[in-house]
Amino acid sequence: MSWRSDHICIELIAGSRKPSNVCWAFILFLGSLGFLLVGTSSYLGRNFIPFFPSQQIIFFPQGIVMSFYGIAGLFISSYLWCTISWNVGSGYDRFDIKEGIVCIFRWGFPGKNRRIFLRFLMKDIQSIRIEVKEGIYARRVLYMEIRGQGSIPLTRTDENLTLREIEQKAAELAYFLRVPIEVF
């Protein structure tokens, strides 16, 4: 989603609060909870899961391994739930022609550097660069080349834009900023 006027362009960036991330975190939580329950029920000799008798799984080595997988899965799912609740990676890109300033803001992980805020002068922007890698894992990323700073990605690597969409986005931004487009 973006907003544009004659002098300002604001592009909102979606973070980790995506339906696919919530789905994976939920599936991982339920699966790891199941593994932990099976491992615990094999240790205690009780049936915590009614449709799965605990006598079929002995604690050593299957119960220990399932408990370990359950605990590891709970740690990974809690990490996913934390990134979803903190909305890591979300933010905005603001291009202000009137003041000649580009501001890039992203939310990070909690701590000293939670707010990532970059400011550049528009005259330092050399070009808008499109990087395309085709194959099994196709990747199309839009970069902004800054003089003396290198490239800054403007799209997420997992955004999976089509070639037409990335070209359209690059053309609109290059036209707004009055800079050339490079393709790699």
From Swiss-Prot:
Domain of life: Eukaryota
Keyword Transmembrane in record: yes
GO cellular component, one term: photosystem I
Presence of the UniProt keyword Chloroplast in the record: yes
Pfam families: Ycf4
Keywords: Chloroplast, Membrane, Photosynthesis, Plastid, Thylakoid, Transmembrane, Transmembrane helix
Subcellular location: Plastid, Chloroplast thylakoid membrane
TM segment ranges: 22-42, 57-77
GO biological process: photosynthesis
Topological category with respect to the lipid bilayer: Multi-pass membrane protein
Alphabetical list of HAMAP family matching this protein: Ycf4 (MF_00437)
Purpose: Seems to be required for the assembly of the photosystem I complex.
Similarity comment text for this entry: Belongs to the Ycf4 family.
Name used for this protein in its record: Photosystem I assembly protein Ycf4
Organism of origin: Morus indica
